[in-house]
Amino acid sequence: AGATTELVRLCDLDIQPCTGCNTCKTGQPCVIEDDMGELYEKLAEADAVVFGSPVYWFRLNAQAYPFIDRFYAYLKPDFSCDFPKGKKFVTAFTCGGVGPEVLNPLNDYLKNVFAFLGFVDAGFIWQGQCYQLNDLANYPEKIEEAKELGRALVR
């Protein structure tokens, strides 16, 4: 049948870095007033998340890191995690000339982050030789692979 999806572009949002104030450890919500509050709600409501990022200089794009750092709000004082378990997670990367030797460690990092939150790894997809926004269109087989991965998420 299908699924309802929403594209969230971190680069279009105001996501401030965590200040380490630890207010979130007192049972209160994060005190930073930015777009992350809405993303906390979206993550809690989602059945699955596809985390996509271009890979720049052997790492995720800059907008990814403040987003991930703010997951600190889910960490309880005893280092357990207060987040609904069992949601599905897929990693998707585009990159220039790098390949699995660079991308696998990034994927492992994200798998660890999202597994800590209780997500279940549901796949990993990537395509190299993508330098411009529309370069992925040159790889119809990869687009079909991504569609199949999406169909698998809703099964």
Residue ranges of predicted features:
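Glycine-rich phosphate/pyrophosphate-binding loop and the adjoining helix
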Residues: N104, D108-R155
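N-terminal beta1-alpha1 ligand-phosphate binding loop
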Residues: A1-A3
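Helix-loop-strand module that forms the ligand-binding subsite of alpha/beta enzymes
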Residues: V31-L117
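Generic structural signal for helix capping and beta-alpha/helix-loop junctions
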Residues: I15, L60, G99, Y131-Q132
